[in-house]
């Protein structure tokens, strides 16, 4: 039996650092999305430590399929259209090259609106919720990046409630609203982004 000389955490860190080199706009994005998902999972108070760990790894590396600048241009827009390529490549990475084969659909569908995702019978409910948590955290991080200009951080919660139940599943929205991070999210998320790039 052969074991790697580094821990899972070190492998994730190595992959994240390499991924951050793809495009400067992605630096720290996965870490911030993972942090936001973590706050939602804490609010749910029903996940095992293994489930939390696995979902945080998926969240940190959710855009690992992105490597083309034109698609990254679309990914960093608030409204996501035509961003399937990176989701497909990320799905293939997780399905064929990691121990996350069963969770790979989370990456494939992390930009899929709830109205479409809920009708896909081949995907288990927990995987759909995980995809929605990453989707919501991803959009929130992009929103915070853009909101620097508009100074309207609190309007995101109203936005997602207005989109629900078409864009986001009600359970994900409820966890987002229950999560305890609004008071410090701006400072904490920016700090987290810096921590992974220094």
Question: Residue locations for each model-derived region?
Answer:
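Histidine- and acidic-residue-rich, metal-dependent catalytic cores
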Residues: 1-198
């Amino acid at each position: 039996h052969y074991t790697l000389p580094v821990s899972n955490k070190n492998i994730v860190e190595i992959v994240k650092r390499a991924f951050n080199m793809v495009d400067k706009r992605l630096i720290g994005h996965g870490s911030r999305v993972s942090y936001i998902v973590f706050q939602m999972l804490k609010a749910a108070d029903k996940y095992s430590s293994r489930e939390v760990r696995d979902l945080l790894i998926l969240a940190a590396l959710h855009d690992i399929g992105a490597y083309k600048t034109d698609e990254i241009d679309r990914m960093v827009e608030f409204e996501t259209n035509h961003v399937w390529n990176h989701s497909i490549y990320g799905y293939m990475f997780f399905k064929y090259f990691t121990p996350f084969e069963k969770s790979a659909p989370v990456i494939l569908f992390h930009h899929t609106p709830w109205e479409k995702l809920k009708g896909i019978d081949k995907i288990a409910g927990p995987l759909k919720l995980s995809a929605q948590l990453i989707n919501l955290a991803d959009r929130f991080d992009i929103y915070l990046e853009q909101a620097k200009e508009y100074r309207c951080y609190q309007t995101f919660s109203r936005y997602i409630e207005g989109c629900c139940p078409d864009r986001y599943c009600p359970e994900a929205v409820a966890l987002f609203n229950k999560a305890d991070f609004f008071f410090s999210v701006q400072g904490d998320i920016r700090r987290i982004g810096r921590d992974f790039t220094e």
